[in-house]
Curated annotation (Swiss-Prot):
Quaternary assembly: Heterodimer of HisH and HisF.
Protein name: Imidazole glycerol phosphate synthase subunit HisH
Gene3D superfamilies xref list: 3.40.50.880
Gene it is expressed from: hisH
Pfam families associated with the record: GATase (PF00117)
GO biological process: L-histidine biosynthetic process
Localization per record: Cytoplasm
Length: 207
């Protein structure tokens, strides 16, 4: 059973509907005692990094997640949820993140090295480039996934499982131990996204 964390800033409907289509058991909760019954957690996220961290702190979700990760239980962050897994962000103001993964979150510059402007936010379909085999990506086909974001993670390459290109290399899937992140929206990413969610569900069940 997967617990989807409801902290007021996640696209709960689309994530839950994707799990339903895959016949993956799930529940949605903001309560730590309930979430503790899950085998794995999904941290979705839409909005601003400082607002999300403020809510996670005020609602005591952060200390709950700290214990969850310390116990090496699976946690998947999606979009903003992935960014929150890192050490810090400069969105609006310098803000500390959950710190489960090394790195920081910065805004796309909007300008190439040659001085050409490009559109921010990054919105649309981009091809995934897999860098190394992992259980999460086993059997997942090559293809495109759907991004909507203005901020991008700067991190160590050894935790980057897959990336995409948007005027720079964009970490798209990251993993360290049982902490996973997807910058794109797998629940909106057709075949590839659904295959990744299915694999996450299989890993949770030990398959």
């Amino acid at each position: 059973m997967i617990g989807i964390i409801d902290y007021g800033m996640g696209n709960l409907h689309s994530v839950s509907k994707a799990l339903e289509r895959l016949a993956i058991p799930y529940f949605i909760s903001s309560d730590g005692e309930e979430l503790a019954k899950a085998k794995a957690l999904i941290l979705p996220g839409v909005g601003a990094f400082p607002d999300a961290m403020n809510i996670l702190t005020q609602t005591n979700v952060q200390p709950f997640l700290d214990n969850w990760v310390a116990e090496n239980k699976p946690l998947l962050g999606i979009c903003l949820g992935m960014q929150l897994l890192f050490e810090s962000s400069n969105e609006h103001q310098p803000t500390a993140g959950l710190g489960y993964l090394p790195g920081r979150v910065e805004r796309f510059s909007g300008t190439t090295a040659e001085g050409h402007a490009y559109k921010v936010p990054h919105m649309g379909w981009n091809k995934l480039e897999f860098h190394r085999p992992t259980p999460l990506t086993e059997g997942v086909p090559d293809g495109y996934v759907y991004f909507v974001h203005s901020y991008v993670v700067r991190t160590e390459t050894d935790i980057v499982v897959a990336s995409s290109d948007y005027y720079q290399s964009v970490p798209a899937i990251v993993q360290k131990g049982q902490v996973y992140g997807m910058q794109f929206h797998p629940e909106k990413s057709s075949t590839v996204g659904m295959a990744l969610l299915k694999r996450f569900g299989q890993l949770v069940e030990g398959n």
